[in-house]
Amino acid sequence: MFAGLAKSLFGSSNDRYVNSIRKIVERINAFEPAMQALDDAGLQGQTATFRARLAAGETLDDILPEAFATVREAAVRTLGMRHFDVQMIGGVVLHRGEIAEMATGEGKTLMATLPCYLNALSGKGVHVVTVNDYLARRDAEWMGAVYGFLGLTTGVIVPNLNETQRREAYNSDITYATNNELGFDYLRDNMKFDRAQMVHRPFNFGIVDEVDSILIDEARTPLIISGPTDDKSELYIRVNEVVLQLTEEDYEKDEKSKSINLTEEGTEHVERLLEAAGLLQGSNLYDIENTQVVHHVNQALKAIQMFRIDTDYIVKDGKVVIIDEFTGRMMEGRRWSDGLHQAVEAKEGVQIEPENQTLASITFQNYFRMYPKLSGMTGTAATEAAEFFDIYKMNVVTIPTNRPIARIDEEDEFYKNINDKFGAIARTIREAQERGQPVLVGTVSIEKSELLSSFLEKEGVAHSVLNARFHESEARIVAQAGRSGAVTIATNMAGRGTDIKLGGNEEFRIEDELKDMPAGPERDAAEARIREEVAAEREAVKAAGGLFVLATERHESRRIDNQLRGRSGRQGDPGLSKFYLCLDDDLLRIFGPDTLFAKMMNKNLEDGEAIGSKWLSKAIETAQKKVEARNYDIRKQVVEYDNVMNDQRKVIYEQRGEIIDSETVDDVMAAMRAETVNAIVADACPPGSYPEQWNVEGMKERVANILNLHPPIDEWMQEDAVDPEMFEERLQRMADATAAEKAALVDAETWKGIEKSILLQTLDHHWKEHLATLDALRQVVFLRAYAQKQPINEYKQEAFALFERMLSNIREDVTRTVARIDFQFQEPEPMPLPELPDFLTTHIDPFTGEDNSADVDAGSLGVIADTLPPMQVPKHDIARGENPYAAMEISRNAPCPCGSGRKYKHCHGAI
């Protein structure tokens, strides 16, 4: 009570913070008349002026008011849109590296142009991150007009771009991209052998659109680049056949944690079935020999009992495609790891793709924390404010709406079962359609959306279905969901990022209806007619109550529910929202106080009857908070474990970068040899031991295996002053001499390339193996809890020990490879001489090598060059200042294609 009274008197901390920004907005507004007075050239010249001021020592905060005013005026001139004051407030929040929570329809896309322009002036680049390719393209094209007018470049990263296009987009002042593309490009860059092949540039400033979706909903899913392993498809199929024969008594499942385990009876049943199928070694399922079979049984059991088609995945074109549980979108290209995807493929009878081994991985949590400054925008972030601060150190600031929200949020309505609920929903929708009110229906799965569709068909209600099966038409369906009497069924995706305008989207209508009509007076008249029709329809829809958002059940997260509500009532429009629930809903069935609900429902409700209660709504909200807390703990645990790998990833990627950028790695190779020699001697001659206790035979064996040396160690042991330091010194000298001999067999540039290649390939191989080991460790370390140990602490200790062992193995393997490298020089096969033009004869003196032929017209030399086989270009091209490879994309550190043996940058690339 007292907190509420204090808030009403003094305002919340959010209100006070927003009010402090209003002073900056007043300064921005003061610049507006001056900006309006400038002609186009003058306004465009502001960019050069700002950059000069930054170069002179001013900060971005110093020029913010004038820069924001410049962008506002540029938007008016290019888009016909003027930033509201609340968008200016949001722009300041984003510039400060915070999260702007802004209601749907308030103009987040336009708001982002303010901090984008300001921060791009530094020349270090700005990334705007969106949830899908459509929004990335749309926003880059739409807002690119503002940036282009002010002299800044805009790029967009979407799938199927080649590396040149990606590099060009990343080098733009402002780059729009999806979170997946950014993450995978980062991982791919850190698998390349040449800096010139990389596409990313250093991180600077990122703005994440729909920040809650990317940094929270997708935080549990790591991005993984993987390579294929052995094909085990036959084993998956046979295990699937075994698991299909199990009954409910054979397993216990926990839907809250999405886990399933065999009972004692189930284990015995599985053992009998596996033995009959010839898949069991011995008689005990849990013998060490059956470890792999146990894993396959567990994954098949999970696939069959816990994963549902049209809810967790769909089968499209003979492939199992994952459905995002939060957005309802297909996640093409994503696969469940650890053999689960293959188990689902076996269940559905489609082709089983080989298992993959992780080559590189990162979570979005750790990827986005690499930005020195990161901000975000969304319509729903307040419920997750604590998580945003704990993990990303980002504050959530709620931006006031430009106009008051006029939407009415009605109490939830409860039914006994799903048939009663869907019947009531269908009748409600029919009534809304009859009065011309558009309805957006939110469902949690494809299965539920198609079930509701069948109910609507029985009621004779015309409607559109938007789910993962039809996502290609998502934007257009959602854009027209505000038309009079329109009924749109959507999974949770609900077209985030696409505004639902009352009366429909006039631009889409013009595009669809007039696509074949050429420009001219007739088209102008048709466009005017459509705009008038849309305006009239908008008023009719407002009179009917605005957009009605009807949800068929509550989601695990209140934030997802709020997102759905937020589709209605944009920019002060009227609207209505309501949730319809029943005991069959997953949230109530799995997390709700089921006994109490069931007793009350069965006692007080007749079939088809509904009940609405604030107490029930409060109970649902309590269940949601429990689920949110559990999911937060899971995400926090993901971060804790991934932080361990992230620290190691930084070290490895930093070392890769240093190797790639170094002109020579001789010092690194010498240090690795020295450490390897020291390790060999230390293992054979432990500190404090006597010579007769040393493992001399083991030392000889390792010296031969790793250093490729056969020194007289037995003779050395007979010397008077024998000690480990003597072995280290002599072996080191011999190993260095061997390496020098190898290097002398080729030219210096070639040897540098060989050393780099050995280092990078060895590093990558061991890092890949290390990732697999960490994955395996993570799967089993939780069992340490039974020994009263903290799994995360155990994981940290073991991961560190594994990392040290990996570094030691890298040093040893690099040293071994260099010691055993062998060169085979082959004479090139003679090339047939080209037929020369009749008018030209040449004579090369066999002793001097001089050309004694007569002078020829320089133009004819090009004819000769054209007749030569590919890549055999006359050497005099360099002298003449010509580079025949200029049009080709060749790395400067790659061998020159002319066959000289030198790097491109020292040969034709130097021209």
Swiss-Prot record:
A matching Pfam family: SecA_DEAD
Cell compartments where the protein resides: Cell inner membrane; Cytoplasm
Biological source species: Sphingopyxis alaskensis (strain DSM 13593 / LMG 18877 / RB2256) (Sphingomonas alaskensis)
Reactions performed catalytically: ATP + H2O + cellular proteinSide 1 = ADP + phosphate + cellular proteinSide 2
Keywords, comma-separated and alphabetical: ATP-binding, Cell inner membrane, Cell membrane, Cytoplasm, Membrane, Metal-binding, Nucleotide-binding, Protein transport, Translocase, Translocation, Transport, Zinc
Transmembrane segment boundaries: none
Family: Belongs to the SecA family.
Cofactor entry: Zn(2+)
Annotated PROSITE patterns: SECA, SECA_MOTOR_DEAD
GO biological process assignments: intracellular protein transmembrane transport; protein import; protein targeting; protein transport by the Sec complex
Cofactor note: May bind 1 zinc ion per subunit.
Membrane-topology descriptor: Peripheral membrane protein
Function description: Part of the Sec protein translocase complex. Interacts with the SecYEG preprotein conducting channel. Has a central role in coupling the hydrolysis of ATP to the transfer of proteins into and across the cell membrane, serving both as a receptor for the preprotein-SecB complex and as an ATP-driven molecular motor driving the stepwise translocation of polypeptide chains across the membrane.
Principal cellular location given in the protein's record: membrane
The name this protein goes by in its record: Protein translocase subunit SecA
Any one cellular-component term (Gene Ontology): cytosol
Family annotation (InterPro entries): Helicase_ATP-bd (IPR014001), P-loop_NTPase (IPR027417), SEC_C_motif (IPR004027), SecA (IPR000185), SecA_CS (IPR020937), SecA_DEAD (IPR011115), SecA_motor_DEAD (IPR014018), SecA_preprotein_X-link_dom (IPR011130)
Assembly description: Monomer and homodimer. Part of the essential Sec protein translocation apparatus which comprises SecA, SecYEG and auxiliary proteins SecDF-YajC and YidC.
The encoding gene: secA
GO MF entries: ATP binding; metal ion binding; protein-exporting ATPase activity
Positions contributing to ATP binding: Q87, G105, E106, G107, K108, T109, D499
Binding-site residues for Zn(2+), renumbered to this chain: C896, C898, C907, H908
The EC number(s) this enzyme carries: 7.4.2.8
